[in-house]
Every structure is written in C-alpha cells, then in structure tokens.
C-alpha cells in the first residue's frame, strides 16, 4: 500500500482528516494517518477505551493542558482511561495514530458522525 495514493477522509470535526491504514473489526484496533490543519485539534479533555499511541511525522501538535508538544519524530502514549487534551495543531500536522482496541467508551460530542469515533 502506498499511503500517498489513499484519499484523506474529512472527519466531522473541522480541520481533521484521516487515512485508515488498518482496522481489526473484532478488537477495533486501528492504525491511521491523522492530519490536523493549522489551528485544528480536539476541543475538550477526554479519555480513550484503549491505549492510544501517536508518532508525529510532520508539524507541531500540542496537548495544551500539559504543554506536551509533538514534533517530527516524537512518540506519545495515552494509556487507557487517562484524561488528556484539549489539543491544537500549531501548524499542519500529520501523525500515525494507533489504538490497541476501541477508541472511545462513547462518541464524543465534537463528532457528529459515529464513524469518526471508531
């Protein structure tokens, strides 16, 4: 698979796009490329139903409550149940995002499309 050949799918949260690379339907584990336009991010503190792993390929992405900033080459883990966020992309940012199970216990309010929470 050449990721450059896959189209970006706009999520229902403005400025956020994804390329789903792999998904296990039985466990809901995923690997995806996520692109945040400059100024986009997750607007509220939240938690995940599984472990979330992020590897930054390009840009600058900040967890504003803690000041953690991802830049190219940064790896970050949000353990299952750990409250984190909000976040903001200070420039266009692309990350590899991996979950080892379902993304959210329930669909967050900032997504109007149920598919965006999986």
Locate the predicted segments by residue.
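A short, N-terminal "cap"/entry segment at the start of jelly-roll beta-barrel domains
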Residues: 1-28, 111-118
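Conserved short histidine dyad/triad with adjacent acidic residue
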Residues: 17-22, 27-47, 79-83
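Structural motif
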Residues: 29-31, 51, 93-94
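Glycine- and acidic-residue-biased ligand/ion/polar-headgroup-sensing regions
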Residues: 38, 47-64
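Short acidic-glycine-tyrosine-enriched beta hairpin
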Residues: 64-83
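Double-stranded beta-helix
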Residues: 89-118
């Amino acid at each position: 698979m050449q990721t450059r050949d896959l189209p970006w799918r706009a999520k229902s949260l403005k400025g956020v796009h994804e390329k789903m690379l792999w998904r296990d339907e039985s466990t809901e584990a995923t690997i995806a490329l996520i692109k945040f336009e400059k100024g986009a991010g997750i607007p509220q503190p939240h938690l995940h139903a599984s472990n979330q792993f992020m590897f930054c390929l390009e840009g600058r992405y900040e967890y504003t409550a803690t000041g953690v900033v991802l830049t190219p080459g940064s790896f970050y883990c949000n353990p299952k149940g750990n409250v984190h966020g909000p976040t903001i992309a200070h420039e266009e940012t692309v990350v590899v995002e991996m979950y080892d199970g379902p993304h959210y216990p329930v669909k967050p309010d900032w997504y109007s499309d149920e598919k965006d929470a999986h």
